[in-house]
């Protein structure tokens, strides 16, 4: 009986140990996801503050200064205000489409962050088709905008949704062709492999120098995908009031506001990964890989800092562009996408393919 009781206790303790391991395993699954979401939220708050400060500097006026030191908490105050506002719904609108549209726009952009390498193998999902996964997921966002415009039962909202869909289709193709050129140079569709391929040759190995035409096209297409000036036709204030956002209020309006900055941040991160060497420091006699070998935590921190520094450099260019260039007409926007960017990006892809074939 003593042996039997001991065996039962051993089995029970083993079962408890296994259940504890499962619980800890589940916790450790959510830790990186929570860390990524927290970092994204912080990044968006910083972008909002930067945009207000930069726009104030360009327009020679005082920016936000009351909410926190230097107005750094202004975005948080605005978000809190929208959170407690009433959610209004159009009486004759399509309620399911009206409610689901903002969520689709935000979730599709959030999923794209899973393939971004912030440092050496510090990526939520290192997939072999990571770059194409981003393109596929980001193509879902305009569907949410179109649903929002149609579900609002408002002519301005519907026209804004149609413009968003047309603009996305027009600039998604040149952007994809530029990504194909990068994948040919790197012989991979993984974002980690693309960064490592650029780190072999240091600063001059960046795809910025190997693909200057593709970089310019990707830059323009990214701004158009983010619907930033001079490409903000879907929500042109003078023509469409607020476009597909016209009938929204409260937290749903705030979701569109967040989605635009999430899209801007993810576009800047992909510019860094594809063209600016990612976490690679690219300074002679200083190798980021040596830092990882000496101290992994220090090397990872340095890699994150380098990635974010390059990202916010591109963000500064995007914000400055918004406040310096006039808005295009709809026909000019479509002509630019279909008649100029598409043929040039296709020619760039064919040229890259030819060079790769001759170099074999």
From Swiss-Prot:
HAMAP family: NDH1_NuoH (MF_01350). Pfam families: NADHdh. Keywords: Chloroplast, Membrane, NAD, NADP, Plastid, Plastoquinone, Quinone, Thylakoid, Translocase, Transmembrane, Transmembrane helix. The chain crosses the membrane at residues 27-47, 98-118, 129-149, 165-185, 203-223, 253-273, 297-317, 340-360. NDH shuttles electrons from NAD(P)H:plastoquinone, via FMN and iron-sulfur (Fe-S) centers, to quinones in the photosynthetic chain and possibly in a chloroplast respiratory chain. The immediate electron acceptor for the enzyme in this species is believed to be plastoquinone. Couples the redox reaction to proton translocation, and thus conserves the redox energy in a proton gradient. PANTHER family: NADH DEHYDROGENASE SUBUNIT 1 (PTHR11432), NADH-UBIQUINONE OXIDOREDUCTASE CHAIN 1 (PTHR11432:SF3). It comes from Arabidopsis thaliana. It is a multi-pass membrane protein. InterPro entries: NADH_UbQ_OxRdtase_su1/FPO (IPR001694), NADH_UbQ_OxRdtase_su1_CS (IPR018086). GO terms for cellular component: chloroplast; chloroplast thylakoid membrane. Belongs to the complex I subunit 1 family. Its main location: plastid. It comes from the Eukaryota. Its EC number is 7.1.1.-. This is NAD(P)H-quinone oxidoreductase subunit 1, chloroplastic. It is an enzyme of class 7 (translocase). GO terms for biological process: photosynthesis; photosynthesis, light reaction.
